[in-house]
Amino acid sequence: MAVDLNQLVDEIRGTVQNLIANCGRRGVEMRPNAGLRTPFDQARLWRQSRTTEEIVEKIDDLKTAGADFLAFCLESVGPQHGAPVTNALPGFSWHQWGEALDCFWVVDGRAEWSTVKKVNGLNGYHVYAEEAEELELTAGGHWTTLKDWPHVQMRAASSPGRIMSINQIDEGMRARFG
């Protein structure tokens, strides 16, 4: 999947281009596969692996908090199935703000998802995380819970919810995607 890096905010766009180039200089090809993500796409990812009860409870919580657009995003995408991939609700991932990028490692022309496999003594995801931090990005592979090796983001704050109120997030998502 081609990712349009121009959809990322200016402050991260050049940095992630440098990140990919720096990895390449170390013999590691990293290819972008997720940049800007709509809150509807985030809702699909969050819903997979969760029970109906958990989903209904979270929709109710969002409505009670006055975050009607976020609740609508979560409710409107319908049932989703799959392994857990995120704890971030719609609006609560930096992807929705254009401040995060996911890349996969390319080995012999194929996507390689292993975080332990080494080629020429290097694991692509570990190189990617190291290089990201050299550029003052936050690397998801170094998180303590639900490690997300393909993910890098501009801010150190793990979530927009750490620096914005739920109402600010709801308003921001409605303005961008509503």
Q: Which positions does each model-derived feature cover?
A:
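Cell-envelope/glycan interface and biosynthesis
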Residues: M1-I166, D170-G178
